[in-house]
UniProtKB/Swiss-Prot annotation:
This is 2-succinyl-5-enolpyruvyl-6-hydroxy-3-cyclohexene-1-carboxylate synthase. InterPro entries: MenaQ_synth_MenD, THDP-binding, Thiamin_PyroP_enz_TPP-bd_dom, TPP_enzyme_TPP-bd. It catalyses: isochorismate + 2-oxoglutarate + H(+) = 5-enolpyruvoyl-6-hydroxy-2-succinyl-cyclohex-3-ene-1-carboxylate + CO2. Catalyzes the thiamine diphosphate-dependent decarboxylation of 2-oxoglutarate and the subsequent addition of the resulting succinic semialdehyde-thiamine pyrophosphate anion to isochorismate to yield 2-succinyl-5-enolpyruvyl-6-hydroxy-3-cyclohexene-1-carboxylate (SEPHCHC). Keywords: Magnesium, Manganese, Metal-binding, Thiamine pyrophosphate, Transferase. It comes from Prochlorococcus marinus (strain AS9601). Its cofactor is Mg(2+); Mn(2+); thiamine diphosphate. The gene is menD.
Amino acid sequence: MTSSIECKNFLRSLQLLNLLIKIGVKNLILCPGSRSAPLAIAAGELNKLGLVNIFNSIDERSAGFHSLGISAASGHLSLVITTSGTAVSNLLPAAVEADRSCKGIIFLTADRPLRLKDCGANQTVNQEDFLSSVCRKVLSTNLNGIHETEENEIFNLVRISEKQMSTFPGPIHLNVPIDKPLDISFLNKKNVLEVFERIYLKKKYVFQEVDIKSDKKKFLEISKNLNLDESGIILVGPYQGSINDLPSFNKSLGQLQEITGWPVFADPVSGVYSDLRGLIVNWELVLRKNKNLINCYQLLRLGPMSSSNDLEKFLINFQGVQILIKEKNHRKLDPIKKSFEYDFGLTNFTSLLKKELSINEKNKKSLTPLALDLLEEGKQVKEILKGNITYENQITEYRLANLVPKLWPAENPIMLSASSPIRDWLTFSENGTLTRNCFSFRGASGIDGTLSLALGISRIKNPLLLVTGDLAFLHDINGWLIENSIDMNLTILLINNNGGNIFNRIYKKNLKEDEFKKLFLMPKEINWPKLAEGYQVNFRSVANFKKLREAFDWSISIEKSAIIKVDIDPQNEICEKNSLLEKIIGS
């Protein structure tokens, strides 16, 4: 085999991607570009061998979010390949969300070699710095070019990445300088592939196992504040662990509940199973109604705080002990700064607690009086909602939050976009998300990447329902440019309130109508059927819940992407919802 640069570029690209596949990469999002050609050609050959799936995206921003959706739904490391220059800067929004939501993703970016840096060379920028503030690691192959990178150096880069994902998952930026020639002849490619398949493809690589040791001293220091003879509440926020660890998480949560007998408040995206004992339905409304009457000694908080003003006020005013247990998240996670934080996860915490208390599987406490009271309060709120939210009502956002979990099949996954949907579902969904996988990207809580994230999830978990407002949907409309996006089994429930409805709840009363629209609402007069037609996406508009049920059946049956639009009157929505909330609080 010739030792030319083009052959070395191709061989090292094959070796790098092959090693990334060995540490868990199954899906690769490829963006267009010339500098990344050796990586793209190598990816294509590995795809032919059945080792990795490739999907292309002409927009790097959408590609980043699409890959993040795949990572969240699969629990596996995902990969994006881009060319150099501004292409890399477009990855930042997805990197921010991956950082905050602790999801494993590698951004593999081609770059110019060192000799072209800082001299005015075309499309040559300081891209190695673009993602550094949010990535767990920023790594690089040889600065002179990947052709000068040794095999053991590539292995070391992948080993570092694998170790990072095992301890504190998140985004990694792997920058790959590549010198010309970028293309490779048919003959040279054939020769390199022969060498790669004969020597490297089936070669066994041993990655050092990461032994994640718990800090028993830290556990004892924190757990001494618990008093299991006193009442408490378990608060489960958005789940940040791997979806593959949800069974062990729920097993540990069930054991913890049996040890304590405490009630459980579960976020719509907590990952908690719906059959958990002590699960309080309508807990946010119960909390709002009884905010000064819920007395207990301690709170066990799992994961980040839910998006609930009522819960935040309750935690701020709570005078007892608060313990916060995190899933492989080593950063501070308590904005009210009142908790003892434990970094090693619920499964580890529960295991140590059982050993410390000498508890076996047969020990099971009855539900505490507080748990029984809260269960009853939740049932009373449920009756009020049942009497005021019916399928005959006009469609509103809060009614959608209550009824859609009953209309969409109980085992089918749902994704809730940021802004209004996640908040409405927390208040009104009555734990309806807990029978299924439910996703919402609450790391940075932005509307960025909504469509691309949903398309990524639907590659793994489908048929998927995305619940989104019109602005969040439009913000990421380029998601439709991802390869075969219209063939995903994805239903989009498009809540059309002609602008950012959440701002109606916050700023409208203090601004003139024209000011409010220009500064916050930002309405867009969209011809939705034409927009859907332009992207070749199936479309329906419905005006009542009966038609919505029929539309769901239709969208699932066609097994392709579909938009189902419902129009909302924001002013009527606010008045009706406030009236219902007043009825609940006064009951």
